[in-house]
């Protein structure tokens, strides 16, 4: 979640040889305080430099303000150093891990004797404020040799590892090493110049700690050194830092709203789903109300796929391991698969093998099985494009540390399609598939998109460079033709082909990766897929992988947070609830709900002993879109009164009109929450 930062490019600034960048910035009249203060500069090669940097020749640089994303990132990295200094002041035996800036904040990992408590975080915040108030200067120092660095950092084992292992220099979370020099940043007393604290770091940093006007520590958690569960256990402290108190307050309010919308919290409050310990991590179960929402999501998707010419298939959950040897998954995706199940082995009495067993795997992806369906009989060019679709359950061994509610699970159902077409059909099929995906997402109320093009990872791919280049170029053409912003994702593709992913912004402006469209020339080769062309020649089809929701579970979680649990009426598990003013009027509402049920509406009457106002509060909390009230006048007039989630109301609507209004609203699949203002025009019809 990010509050948008102004990304205006400052005019180039000339820094004379022998002059610090900071001096040139001040003499040019740039702001010296406030959210637009310049914190670093960008040189001609795009590298961010400290304001203390002194070029040897005249250079043009771009001043970078605190209120830009790059400026914020530098502030957050410096705040991570302040945090680390505070931790070592409060916990002198703490050893330093890594402390990078991340989206909207920063973290630092520490080896300490026990987990941090909320009270610890409060103490650390107090200590950080003292450090910031002291205006310590960040001073870059080049270490003469690796040996000198080892001596200076002898008490920091994790830093020593980073010095010796340069494999992390391209990792954005490894800020300690990189480039041609080994550098340490000292925090200096502004009056005496004495070193107060230091850390191995490649920088850059803000000039002084006073350039951190707003920060907050948000939480702590367990972590592993370098993210590897086989490494040392560490404690991670997260925080956020901003260019102004106003910007931070805006972010914290956004964070609070995100917590209110957290699908895990709402899943419990609305009785939608749960994660029983007995099943294991990342394996959700959907309760009846959640099951209704999921069924409605799937049913609408099915109807749209039928209209678009998809054919439905079904495949098993497990398969022999040989299938994934053919597909390449065991070579390239084994770490993401559950371990093999060795079955069907028979032993003699002496323990020797009479009949060898076989390895079976839970399927991590549906594509190999869909290829077997394509290959089950001869195919003609007349059948292409062939669009095979399945709500297919797959299982992936996600590390426990990354599992998160419904948005990152181990068992999931993908709305998975594989399209087989000729090369001549490829571009048109990609174009129509992308448009189909975007239109269907809009039908669920998501309509703010951009595209991301993931290209080849040079260390992890199969197939020829020529084929990859053709596939990538075609996807790029289709993405650009859509009119949406196309953002590059270098090296982000799966091993078998480049992809376009649809990135969706929700009601809070957060970005979620949703649909993927992946071009694959590789698997048809590995599975020897063929069709007979119009010239009678056997030809390889082009294969397109396509998942619209990503997974049903993930999409469910995203929609829950997008709507804050107040699902559109067509998806709501309970669409209408009748609330009598007194028990005597309950039968009237029961008759109304019978009519609604006959029209396919999910309706019920609250017969509880609670007072009417409490019933209204309860069903408002449960996000019921339509509440129908009935008192003496309503019964006498054969009418009901509408009450909506926002507290608005329309009184005295004839029952038949009320049924019509509700069924039409649901039938149109309106994604807005019904209110008196929105429903009133239908009353007048």
From Swiss-Prot:
Residues 262-568 are annotated as: Catalytic. It is an enzyme of class 6 (ligase). Residues 1-65 form the TGS domain. Zn(2+) binds at residues 367, 418, 545. GO terms for molecular function: ATP binding; metal ion binding; threonine-tRNA ligase activity; tRNA binding. Residues 1-28 are annotated as: Disordered. Its cofactor is Zn(2+). The keyword Ion transport does not apply. Keywords: Aminoacyl-tRNA synthetase, ATP-binding, Cytoplasm, Ligase, Metal-binding, Nucleotide-binding, Protein biosynthesis, RNA-binding, tRNA-binding, Zinc. Its EC number is 6.1.1.3. Binds 1 zinc ion per subunit. The keyword ATP-binding applies. Its main location: cytoplasm. It is found in: Cytoplasm. One of its GO terms (cellular component) is cytoplasm. It catalyses: tRNA(Thr) + L-threonine + ATP = L-threonyl-tRNA(Thr) + AMP + diphosphate + H(+). GO terms for biological process: threonyl-tRNA aminoacylation. Belongs to the class-II aminoacyl-tRNA synthetase family. Homodimer. Catalyzes the attachment of threonine to tRNA(Thr) in a two-step reaction: L-threonine is first activated by ATP to form Thr-AMP and then transferred to the acceptor end of tRNA(Thr). Also edits incorrectly charged L-seryl-tRNA(Thr). This is Threonine--tRNA ligase.
């Amino acid at each position: 979640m990010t509050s948008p930062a102004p990304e205006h490019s400052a005019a180039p600034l000339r820094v004379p040889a022998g002059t610090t960048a900071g001096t040139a910035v001040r003499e040019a009249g740039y702001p010296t305080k406030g959210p637009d203060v310049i914190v670093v500069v960008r040189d001609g090669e795009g590298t961010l430099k400290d304001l203390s940097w002194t070029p040897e020749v005249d250079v043009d640089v771009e001043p970078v303000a605190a209120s830009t994303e790059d400026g914020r990132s530098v502030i957050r990295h410096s705040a991570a150093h302040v945090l680390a200094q505070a931790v070592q002041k409060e916990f002198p035996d703490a050893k330093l891990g890594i402390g990078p800036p991340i989206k909207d904040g920063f973290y630092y990992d520490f080896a300490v004797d026990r987990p941090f408590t909320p009270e610890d975080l409060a103490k650390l915040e107090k200590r950080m404020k003292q450090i910031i108030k002291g205006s310590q200067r960040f001073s870059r120092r080049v270490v003469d040799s690796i040996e000198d660095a080892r001596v200076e950092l002898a008490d920091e084992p994790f830093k020593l590892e980073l010095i010796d292992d340069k494999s992390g220099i391209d990792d954005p979370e490894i800020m300690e090493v990189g480039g041609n020099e080994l550098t340490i940043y000292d925090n200096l007393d502004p009056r005496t110049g004495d070193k107060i604290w230091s850390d191995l770091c490649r920088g850059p940093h803000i000039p002084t700690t006073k350039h951190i006007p707003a920060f907050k520590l948000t939480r702590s958690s367990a972590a592993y050194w370098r993210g590897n569960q086989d490494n040392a256990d560490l404690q991670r402290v997260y925080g956020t830092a901003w260019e102004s108190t106003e910007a931070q307050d805006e972010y914290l309010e956004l964070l609070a709203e995100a917590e209110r919308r957290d699908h895990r919290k709402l899943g419990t409050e609305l009785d939608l789903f749960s994660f029983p310990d007995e099943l294991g991590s990342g394996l959700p179960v959907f309760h009846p109300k959640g099951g209704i929402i999921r069924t409605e999501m799937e049913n609408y998707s099915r109807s749209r796929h039928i209209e678009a010419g998809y054919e439905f298939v079904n495949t098993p959950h497990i398969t022999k391991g040989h299938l994934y040897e053919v597909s390449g998954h065991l070579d390239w995706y084994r770490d993401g698969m559950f371990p093999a199940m060795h079955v069907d082995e028979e032993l003699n009495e002496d323990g020797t093998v009479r009949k060898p067993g076989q390895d079976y795997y839970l399927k991590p992806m549906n594509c190999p099985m869909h290829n077997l369906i394509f290959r089950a009989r001869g195919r003609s060019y007349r059948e292409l494009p062939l669009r095979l679709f399945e709500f297919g359950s797959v299982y992936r061994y996600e590390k426990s540390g990354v599992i998160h509610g419904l948005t990152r699970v181990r068992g999931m159902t993908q709305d998975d399609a594989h399209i087989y077409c000729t090369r001549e059909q490829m571009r048109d099929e990609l174009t129509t598939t992308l448009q189909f995906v975007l239109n269907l997402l809009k039908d669920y109320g998501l309509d703010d998109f951009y595209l991301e093009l993931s290209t080849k990872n040079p260390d992890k791919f199969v197939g020829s460079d020529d084929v990859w280049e053709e596939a990538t170029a075609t996807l790029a053409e289709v993405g650009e033709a859509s009119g949406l912003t196309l953002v590059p994702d270098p090296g982000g593709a799966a091993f078998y082909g480049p992809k376009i992913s649809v990135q969706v912004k929700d009601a809070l402006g957060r970005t979620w990766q949703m649909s993927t469209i992946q071009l694959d020339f590789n698997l048809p080769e590995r599975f020897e897929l063929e069709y007979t062309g119009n010239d009678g020649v056997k030809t390889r089809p082009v294969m397109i992988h396509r998942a619209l929701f990503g997974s049903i579970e993930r999409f469910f979680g995203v929609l829950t947070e997008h709507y804050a649990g107040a699902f559109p009426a067509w998806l709501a598990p309970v669409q209408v609830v009748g609330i009598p003013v007194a028990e005597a009027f309950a039968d009237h509402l029961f008759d109304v709900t019978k009519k609604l049920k006959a029209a396919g509406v999910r309706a019920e009457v609250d017969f509880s002993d609670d007072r009417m106002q409490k019933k209204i509060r309860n069903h408002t909390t449960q996000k019921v879109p339509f509440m129908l009230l009935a008192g003496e006048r309503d019964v006498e007039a054969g009418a009901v009164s509408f009450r909506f989630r926002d507290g608005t109301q329309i009184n005295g609507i004839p029952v038949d009109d009320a049924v019509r209004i509700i069924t039409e609203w649901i039938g149109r699949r309106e994604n807005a929450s019904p209110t008196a203002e929105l429903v009133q025009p239908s009353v007048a019809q």
